[in-house]
Regions:
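Bacterial N-terminal signal peptides that target proteins for export
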Residues: 2-16
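C-terminal motif of bacterial Sec signal peptides marking the signal peptidase cleavage site
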Residues: 21-26
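Bacterial signal peptide processing site
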Residues: 28-31
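Short, glycine-/small- and polar/acidic-enriched structural segments
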Residues: 35, 43-192, 208-211
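Short, solvent-exposed loop/beta-turn-alpha elements that line the ligand-binding surface or hinge
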Residues: 74-81, 181, 233-237, 306-315
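Pocket-lining segment of extracytoplasmic ligand-binding domains
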Residues: 184-187, 197-289
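Secondary-structure end/capping motifs
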Residues: 253-334
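Conserved C-terminal helix/tail region of periplasmic/extracytoplasmic solute-binding proteins
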Residues: 324-365
Length: 365
């Protein structure tokens, strides 16, 4: 549950740039850019003064909040004369639209929007440069729902058409024997709304459930729901990518030192989260309050935090599986994957592993 406040943090976050919420399906091409390996061209960091960063009010994006609140972005990018300008999105498709429109340089996004950006641009628009989080998504339903059959004829929700939770929900429903189309019509209706609107609609009884990321799953539980499916239970070892970090390919080619400085800050944030989880939660809440005027209820936040594993491992195999799920439910064509050259070229972990090597850490494969 979220609480409202008029208090504003003056430490690191300023006014947000507004980005139009265009339909992802309308984006049939990217701004292009070279796809040469990172570090193969010289950077001109002096040519830019701002790194435009996109992320969500989701717990799986906590490394961004921690890096802002603890000053890691300011310190590491500041040595290059670059500052971070954050932009908040509800879900991945909107963030991908901003990447395509050259309105954002780097973004924390889920696997399915990453796949859509990669395939729609035929492998030209983006690169995955790091992981950020695993886990932290659940299907929470009303107390009178005890099985999938109880959902027939009812309406459930996900944050946005084609986003990671939307694919997971439709795939799971179809695997359980329901018939749900890509547009959400079928024996169970799947609608889309912002995470905060989902919590409100669930509380008023307009929704019977929702597949959402943390902390919204815990908010639904606090509103009287219970977990029908914890997505951790659907993946081997409970590991599956919920958030990766992607960069525009052109930005990576032109400014590899800026990207490396960004990744250094993100690695520092991950280390801080591991060592200081309580303060990291406070950083997330403070950052969220500064950006949105809302914060997560203190009774909810620790429970939500426990559902997430923060990691720089992009967990590639689970992204590939998520893409197969999207194909299965009609939200992606296999020919689009093939047309982009598969998923191996999507990943460029060169700079991440340089950062890890400096910290005496083994490379991420």
């Amino acid at each position: 549950m979220f609480s409202r406040s008029r208090r504003r943090r003056t430490t690191v976050l300023a006014a947000l740039a507004a980005v139009s919420a265009l339909a992802l399906a309308a984006c049939s091409s990217s701004s292009g850019g070279s796809t040469s390996p990172s570090g193969s061209s010289s950077s001109s960091a002096s040519e830019i003064t701002t790194l435009r960063l996109g992320f969500f009010p989701n717990l799986t994006h906590a490394p961004a909040y921690v890096a802002l609140q603890e000053g890691y972005f300011k310190d590491d990018l500041g040595t290059l004369g670059v500052k971070v300008a954050p932009t908040l999105f509800n879900a991945g498709p909107d963030a991908v639209t901003a990447l395509f429109a050259n309105a954002v340089d780097i973004a924390y996004v889920g696997p399915n929007p990453t796949v859509n950006a990669w395939t729609q641009s035929k492998g030209a628009a983006i690169k995955v440069i790091s992981g950020a989080a695993s886990g932290g998504a659940s299907f929470v339903v009303a107390k009178d729902i005890t099985s999938v059959k109880d959902l027939e004829g009812k309406t459930v929700a996900s944050p946005q058409l084609g986003n990671t939770q939307d694919v997971a929900l439709k795939y799971w429903l179809n695997k359980q024997g329901e018939q749900v189309a890509a547009d959400g019509t079928g024996s169970v209706t799947v609608t889309n709304a912002s995470n905060s609107d989902i919590v409100t609609a669930f509380g008023t009884g307009d929704l019977s459930g929702a597949w959402v990321p943390e902390p919204y799953a815990q908010s639904l539980i606090a509103a009287g729901g219970h977990v029908l499916v914890n997505e951790n239970d659907l993946w081997p070892g409970g590991k599956f990518v919920t958030t990766n970090i992607v960069v525009r390919s052109q930005f990576l080619d032109e400014h590899p030192d800026v990207v490396q400085a960004f990744l250094t800050a993100n690695e520092q944030a991950l280390a801080f989260i591991k060592k200081n989880p309580t303060q990291a939660q406070a950083d997330f809440n403070s950052g969220l309050l500064a950006l949105t005027g809302s914060s997560v209820d203190s009774a909810i936040l620790p429970k939500a935090w426990d559902q997430v594993t923060f990691t720089d491992d992009p967990l590639k195999a689970t992204l590939v599986a998520s893409a197969a799920h999207a194909v299965s439910v009609g939200l992606l064509e296999q020919s689009a994957i093939d047309g982009a050259g598969g998923f191996d070229p999507l990943y460029d972990l060169t700079l991440l592993n340089k950062v890890r090597a400096k910290a005496s850490l083994p490379p991420v494969q």
